């Protein structure tokens, strides 16, 4: 072969290789165009977009970025269209790309975002089964890749799913596994995994809060507050503080509960979490339980929510409570029954209502010395047994001086004048008793050494003398008492 023939063959070979590269580039461009065209139509025509995305992976000679991206979009669309079985199958296909087709960091971030996306479907029972399958497939896939971060994140999400399902035994097992993964070989917490530890504590605190295990809740709550090696997401801090507030409420520690609910509200607000509205209601609830006259909306963080319609009913309740307006308070409760849809509010509002009615009773009985229980019940719009219960508490507590005649259904109050008369008679009775003992039981006369006794007798005589005036005034006192008792309410 001549040199010219050789050069000609070489040129032909070179041209052929160049043409192959050009065809490959053209193929990539076609796939890219197909991908972006599908993205543009996924809102207007999700069905067409879904078919376009699913047609991309077979076009690649080897698994690559465009197939990975197309499958991600297809799975999200299928999940949105509630085609959970198809979404699960394509997610399983997507996981085959993570070992070689895409980089480790990109695959980890993409999978984590995908799991965050599907978490929005917790309200649909069918979606929950699909979500759990996604978690299971993810853990199986990354178990062999030694990707601890994604393993921890996925297991935390799975524990949260189990908690939402109230499968507490499964949650407890999963949390033990996670705690062990966040500890060093000597059993102490690993500072490098502080953020994960705090998330795990938050889940465990939620579990004990829901199961009313206050002993364990206290221990974990204190542990969580002492974690300093983490930069927690404000939502996690909000969860911890909210559970802390509920714990303090169960112990009737209103002040600490208010402090924790405020911190929970502030953190949820910072995270943009809608839970802030519910916690704000709890904060207003503790304001009433503390019997505080301070307007909670004076704080900088709460001012923007002063006129928020979502908390209008609670704001009205607080205003009525602070004004001692029992009628308005009861009207707000009757017109806003949805307030009691929250079990926590329903459980604690009774204490506020009782305080409100107690203040109403004290206010009503103030001008009178005698009144019927039925009259009080009618004025307060409650039953007679409820009035009796409140009055009994006030009498035992010493805030009301009086007695209840259950047979007649009447409350009789002691006036100040009545109390003075009773005290005077008591002193007189004791003095007469002492005099009787001295005069009639001493048969041997006065003996030497009884000077102290004589002095004592002189003092008693003085006491009796001073009581004469009191006894003389009892006639007019009785008249005054009779006048007082005519101040009645029936």
Swiss-Prot record:
Residues 250-418 form the PCI domain. Keywords: Cytoplasm, Nucleus, Signalosome. Its main location: cytoplasm. InterPro entries: 26S_Proteasome/COP9_Components, PCI_dom, WH_DNA-bd_sf. It is found in: Cytoplasm; Nucleus. GO terms for biological process: protein deneddylation. It comes from Neurospora crassa (strain ATCC 24698 / 74-OR23-1A / CBS 708.71 / DSM 1257 / FGSC 987). This is COP9 signalosome complex subunit 2. GO terms for cellular component: COP9 signalosome; cytoplasm. Component of the COP9 signalosome (CSN) complex that acts as an regulator of the ubiquitin (Ubl) conjugation pathway by mediating the deneddylation of the cullin subunit of SCF-type E3 ubiquitin-protein ligase complexes. The CSN complex is involved in the regulation of the circadian clock through its control of the stability of the SCF(FWD-1) complex. Residues 1-32, 469-490 are annotated as: Disordered.
